[in-house]
Amino acid sequence: MLGGCLSTGTQSVANSVSQLVRSNIEIDYDDTKMRAAGAGVLQAQFGGRGSVYMGLHSLNLQTYDLLFVSNDGVGLEMYNGHIRATTKLVADIRSVTPLSGDPFFDGFLELHPAKTYFWKIQSASGYGLVAHARYRFSGTEQIKTAYGSWDLAHWVESWSVEELDYQVDNHYWVDKQGIVVKSIQQPLPDHERMDLLLYSYKPVVTQ
């Protein structure tokens, strides 16, 4: 069981992560094996190209970041669906760090559209970049994973990096426990737009 001081939303995320990390894989995607082992599988599209499947490789016990790795070595480090670092992409992110609160930690609870969040980004585009983000609710949509279709809250992230004159809307689909199941993200202009789905997702069953 993951320890530490966690919010209610983050505890749900941590419980889900615990279930996934029990099977730590770096293998070719196998639907039967995924279902039998409860393995973490991320379905990813980069720049609108075909889907690739990335296996859950490891969990950082200090930050609770999940590292998903593809067969060709591309890595996405994520905290509750939010990209925190990448490896072996055309342009990589070294780190994304929250500076004033973190809606992904809080499980998207009590978000106000007027509240601004700040993120420090370290990447090849520049050191010490700061992104500004606001979040607004955009309704409920049905998202399909390997285990079924689920009604999820759609949140739009208005993301901007003033130093690069860059603005974009990123999208997150979140379950009732605050877990990000699907996202569309492009943190910086020299990165490809990433469409990410936690393909192995199924709702956490509470006792």
Describe the predicted segments one by one.
Residues 2-4:
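C-terminal motif of bacterial Sec signal peptides marking the signal peptidase cleavage site
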Residues 6-95, 110-207:
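Acidic, serine/threonine-rich low-complexity disordered tracts
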Residues 98:
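Active-site acidic/histidine clusters and adjacent loop/turn architecture
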Residues 101-103:
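A small/polar (G/S/T-enriched), proline-flanked helix-loop surface module common
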